Regions:
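Conserved end of the kinase activation segment
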Residues: 211-221
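Activation of the activation-loop gatekeeper triad in protein kinase-fold domains
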Residues: 185-190
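Juxta-kinase regulatory segment immediately upstream of eukaryotic protein kinase catalytic domains
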Residues: 1-41, 78
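Catalytic-loop of the protein kinase fold
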Residues: 155-176
Length: 281
């Protein structure tokens, strides 16, 4: 089977030259642009690049276009099913925010093939990762505690719903208006009624269980990132100054890849396991 690949630069070029589905994605003038060449400003993730689109007729939207290997027809069909399930708000899923989305099969035209896209509401706010570290620097223990409780609630709601997620991290949870949590990455969204695809993404290295690259879809290890986030927020809510020592502003709240790979050698694990206040709480 022929494998198609695409670069971000090719996606931007197609948007600039109107080689895309204008009817479904919207006029080029609505796509956020900027320097140095006044071209579409894309926010690249691990497998897709996201553009902001403002329109007088529609709400502000996020347009997610995959780069690298183009999704297969099977993947597109699966995402369409997931989109319909989200719209139905089954099993009380309206109690927490899995952001709904539409799948545009023929979205961007590059050479002799078409690239799909996901279109979803634009969520204004800060990522959990950014907000948590900002709160810690500001010594906002109350804010950190509220974030922790919100993540705990999110985990419980996942357990009660038919949905699950294969790539939770501090970067794909947005904190929007009124402190609401929004999961903005639907690529590894799961539903009990849909057959799971082959394992292709192993999760963010600062959140995922190290054994993820040796297993198939497994709910317990897919919830492991939530535990990493809860422990990180709990530790920061008790001792915000940990933000000055552990984690980084780009990839992690507290834990980094080496902490999860080699906990016995981790300074962070050693601190948390031997700190009286952390243990007692």
């Amino acid at each position: 089977m022929l494998v198609r690949t695409v670069r971000i630069s090719e996606i931007i070029s197609s948007l600039k030259n109107d080689n895309y589905n204008v009817r479904r994605l919207g006029n080029y003038s609505g796509i956020k642009q900027g320097g140095p060449f006044n071209e579409p400003l894309g926010n690249p993730g691990a497998t897709s690049v996201t553009f902001r689109h403002d329109s007088k007729k529609n709400i502000t939207r996020a347009i997610r276009v995959p780069y690298g290997v183009i999704p297969t027809e099977e993947t597109i069909q699966r995402m369409n099913k997931m989109s319909k399930l989200l719209r139905r708000r089954e099993n009380g899923t309206n109690n927490f925010s899995l952001v709904p989305f539409d799948v545009i099969k023929s979205a961007v035209y590059i050479q002799d093939f078409e690239v799909p896209a996901i279109v979803m509401p634009w969520i204004e706010g800060k990522t959990l990762h950014e907000l948590a570290r900002n709160f810690a620097r500001a010594n906002n223990q109350k804010g950190l505690n509220l974030l922790m409780k919100g993540i705990e609630k999110l985990g419980k709601q996942f357990q009660l719903s038919a949905f699950d997620h294969g790539d939770i991290s501090g970067g794909n949870i947005m904190i929007g208006e009124k402190g609401l949590l929004h999961i903005i990455d639907p690529d590894t969204l799961l539903h009990e009624s849909i057959t799971n695809p082959p394992l292709t993404e192993f999760g963010h290295v600062s959140y995922a269980h190290p054994n993820r690259n040796h297993i198939q879809w497994e709910s317990d290890l897919y919830r492991f990132p939530l535990e990493v986030i809860v422990v990180s927020l709990m530790a920061l809510s008790i001792k915000p100054s940990l933000v000055k020592i552990f984690g980084d502003d780009d990839n992690s709240i507290l834990f980094v890849q080496d902490d999860l790979l080699k906990p016995q050698e981790s300074k962070l694990f050693n601190y948390l396991c031997n700190h009286n206040c952390i243990i007692s709480c």
